[in-house]
From Swiss-Prot:
Organism: Methylocella silvestris (strain DSM 15510 / CIP 108128 / LMG 27833 / NCIMB 13906 / BL2)
Gene: mraY
EC class name: transferase
Protein name: Phospho-N-acetylmuramoyl-pentapeptide-transferase
GO CC term, one of those recorded: plasma membrane
Lineage, highest ranks first: Bacteria, Pseudomonadati, Pseudomonadota, Alphaproteobacteria, Hyphomicrobiales
Pathways per UniProt: Cell wall biogenesis; peptidoglycan biosynthesis
Amino acid sequence: MLTWLTQFSPHFQPLNLFRYITFRTGGATATALFFVFFFGPRIIAALRIKQGKGQPIRLDGPQSHLLTKKGTPTMGGLMILSGLIVSTLLWANLRNHYVWVVLFVTTGFGLIGFYDDYLKVSKQSHKGFPGRIRLLLEVGIAGAACYAMMLLGTPHTTSLAFPAINGFAVDLGLFFLVVGPFVIVSAGNAVNLTDGLDGLAIVPVMIAAGTFGVIAYLAGNAIFSTYLGINFVPGAGELSVVTGAVIGAGLGFLWFNAPPAQIFMGDTGSLALGGLLGAVAVAVKHEIVLAIVGGLFVLETLSVIVQVISFKLTGRRVFKMAPIHHHFEQLGWSEPQVVVRFWIIAFVLALIGLSTLKLR
């Protein structure tokens, strides 16, 4: 929105700063951070009153959680999403269709997560939105977003690029409408599965957002993309502003979500943020790199899949508990140990993901 101020730059030179993506990304980060800082306590207080008993704690989870997390309100994703959306609308170029597509996915997934959280809190049960209906809605939203990208994007919007291989990509054609939604829906649910400990999901989300902010900036620049041998995606650089808003809102939320958490992000936040990461990855044509950068989310998801398949086929569990962060809790790791070590893994994976830009 603030980009319109650039038309007055001939009369006041500093307004020319609003032309630069890097400046607006910093502004989006700061705005989202202060928004969540300011409104966070008010939102937490309101949710605590509305929810009463807070998020129901699973009886089949770690027993310590029944004591340490009981009564904590959920739906903290409202803090993140409100800060993220307000900041994006303020600092991004609203004529950029990628911004609107990503916000569409984020808001849509956030609404699904919100309804899921509402059902869990109102019924005081871990059973929320019926899985099949929820998945169908996610696929519908992701499919609509990918279709919009096809209509508004470039000729290589439907291509799938492979990291570390210069210029090699496969044109998916209409199959893009299968692969794209799969990436977005998978990312949303993977982050959702990871959100099981105080601060565990939000920091890896911020790390991934920062990484894809860099990738979006490079992919949206004709000179940098040509030099690196990656697809040039006109307008993709504007998504750096969105990822900057994610980082700012995430930092603000972490202030209240640090152990012991005053609030949980719930499905409202985790599903929306995961969907956002997936949508950005699809938009900038680095879907496979997302699996590297978000490798922690992939690991959490695979641990659940392996656990379910193993138990159904053999009656035995591979892990003491799934997702895998609970497995390490059962091994005797304290919650802060699990969280910080997983943060380290996420940071290392982000560095590996970024390195693929030069390994070509």
